[in-house]
């Protein structure tokens, strides 16, 4: 299933429709809150998102994240221009920080998979 905004290239959307279900939602950007409502009405009550920092930030900002999994591996990836978990404006004030409660920690090879519940979605 793929979600695109109304400004998406019509030719590309037509090609996508031949291979997947395409939901057109939002004018310039996909309206994430509306999209989640649409998915819910279609019977989708739980989703897994493997998106980039912009999508993850948008979901947090809209209060649409109720749990998150993070993986801590045995290599360091970083630097000024390295991607982060969330992009966008960021969480500047203490009151806007997403608060997490650790649900589970599981060792996988040389890393740890952490399952968090979001306290204040």
Question: Which positions does each model-derived feature cover?
Answer:
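Enzymes that bind and transform nitrogen-containing heteroaromatic metabolites
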Residues: 1-121
């Amino acid at each position: 299933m793929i979600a695109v905004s109304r400004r998406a290239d019509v030719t590309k959307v037509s090609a996508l429709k031949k291979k997947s279900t395409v939901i057109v939602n939002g004018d310039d950007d996909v309206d994430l809150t509306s999209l989640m409502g649409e998915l819910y009405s279609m019977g989708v009550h739980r989703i897994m998102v493997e998106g980039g920092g912009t999508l993850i930030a948008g979901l947090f900002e809209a209060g649409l994240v109720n749990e998150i999994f993070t993986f801590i591996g045995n290599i360091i990836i970083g630097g000024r221009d390295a991607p982060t978990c969330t992009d966008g404006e960021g969480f500047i004030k203490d009151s806007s920080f997403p608060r997490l409660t650790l649900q589970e920690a599981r060792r996988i090879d040389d890393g740890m998979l952490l399952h968090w519940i979001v306290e204040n979605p």
